[in-house]
Amino acid sequence: MNDFWQHCSALLERELTPQQYVTWIKPLAPVAFDASANTLSIAAPNRFKLDWVKSQFSGRISDLAREFWNTPIEVQFVLDPKAGMRSAAASAAPAAPRAPLTPGGPAATVAAIAANLTANAAAAPSAPADVPMTPSAAAAHHLNADDADIDLPSLPAHEAAAGRRTWRPGPGAAPANGGEADSMYERSKLNPVLTFDNFVTGKANQLARAAAIQVADNPGISYNPLFLYGGVGLGKTHLIHAIGNQLLLDKAGARIRYIHAEQYVSDVVKAYQRKAFDDFKRYYHSLDLLLIDDIQFFSGKSRTQEEFFYAFEALVANKAQVIITSDTYPKEISGIDDRLISRFDSGLTVAIEPPELEMRVAILMRKAQSEGVNLSEDVAFFVAKHLRSNVRELEGALRKILAYSKFHGREISIELTKEALKDLLTVQNRQISVENIQKTVADFYNIKVADMYSKKRPANIARPRQIAMYLAKELTQKSLPEIGELFGGRDHTTVLHAVRKIADERSKDAQLNHELHVLEQTLKG
């Protein structure tokens, strides 16, 4: 059994990207093999990993097991028995004060974390020494901040003085009165409308949503930090607000803060101007959950990055959860310090892709329903087919349709929709051409554009050509025969094969998915 798993792991390590292997395969362990029943049991450390590995890798592991034993093997995925023991220990553990972790040290057990959550307070760690900023550097980082105070929601006086944390398990319900709820939302800057319940899920965001729920259920334990990246309007901000809102319901008194990266930069500038870094650090280092949006705005701002690094280290050491969003993969954010990039990579990084057709339809139907409008599926499909980039664009188009319908006193139909979105559809149709896709893909994979039309079949040419066909089908209104004609007169079945092949591989191969994401963002400008 162990020999097989070493063999299997070695093969999968070669087949998968390092991130895929470390995230999904390395944590697995074989726990039982029944030769008489031809069954192999493999344990996963938590339910989230178990479900994902079962859905994404069970087929490949079963194939490798069959090849190894020369007979069909039923591979069963089970929850690590030690996880159950840890969970039981957590429920029985007495309350204990927090024990800060050293950065990079071993992860705390579930029992220790559960005990920490019951502690009423613990001293926050002292921040590393501040590095002075030269006047010229300060001027370079100045953001025309106004004279308002630093945007730090007020803390109770005794907590502010002691830098104490007050995360206590709550009754799983909202605050008892509206005033208290308003105060909580004012301090946290959360949008109470953005919840898991009204987040539309599809293939493009299912992993991100699953990870977000896991973090909301086990803050500071499961994935820290959680880093979500993707283009504008794909739901990153919705998801992180949903995590914060869920935590407010589950844990009364949790100290939560949502902040856009630009506001954080502004806070750093004002703290420097007023020599108020002690207050700044006391506030940010004492949070239980920090949600920071669009961290790419930290690019080139060295003092902000330095302060955020200190805050990050203090929060993670105290088992507080950090969640970050960006418009691109961490290592591709320019102007960010390497030590911050390495901290981002230490947790779980998940992409949110543009929504697929069915998801776009569901978003439109859900949004129309919330507006009290009965939108037909025909209209929803028409809009979803023509607008592909992001959720925000879809919602904007729907608002335009509703306003046009109301103004003209006509029922919503495909004809009315075409009229209402005339300008938008014209822009969309001329934005991306098959020729542009071919050139962009050829440049990306370092081949000639002429190779897109040629009959050459080496892998280094055939693969980019298939990717270009897939993108042509996804990003233009061309039919399969039309796309085939533009790729050297190929038959539509060749295009269909390429589209299906790349779509299937995209769902399994993180590296390919990332490359397609980059190409799509490049083509959409």
From Swiss-Prot:
State the residue spans of region: Domain I, interacts with DnaA modulators.
Answer: 1-71
Q: Where is the composition biased (Low complexity)?
A: 169-181
For the region Domain II, give the residue spans: 71-188
| SMART domains linked | AAA, Bac_DnaA_C
Work out whether the entry's keyword set contains Ligase: no
The protein's superkingdom reads Bacteria
Matching entries from CDD domains are given as:
AAA, Bac_DnaA_C
Described function? Plays an essential role in the initiation and regulation of chromosomal replication. ATP-DnaA binds to the origin of replication (oriC) to initiate formation of the DNA replication initiation complex once per cell cycle. Binds the DnaA box (a 9 base pair repeat at the origin) and separates the double-stranded (ds)DNA. Forms a right-handed helical filament on oriC DNA; dsDNA binds to the exterior of the filament while single-stranded (ss)DNA is stabiized in the filament's interior.
**Family matches, as PANTHER family:** CHROMOSOMAL REPLICATION INITIATOR PROTEIN DNAA
Family affiliation: Belongs to the DnaA family.
Instruction: Give the protein's recorded name.
Output: Chromosomal replication initiator protein DnaA
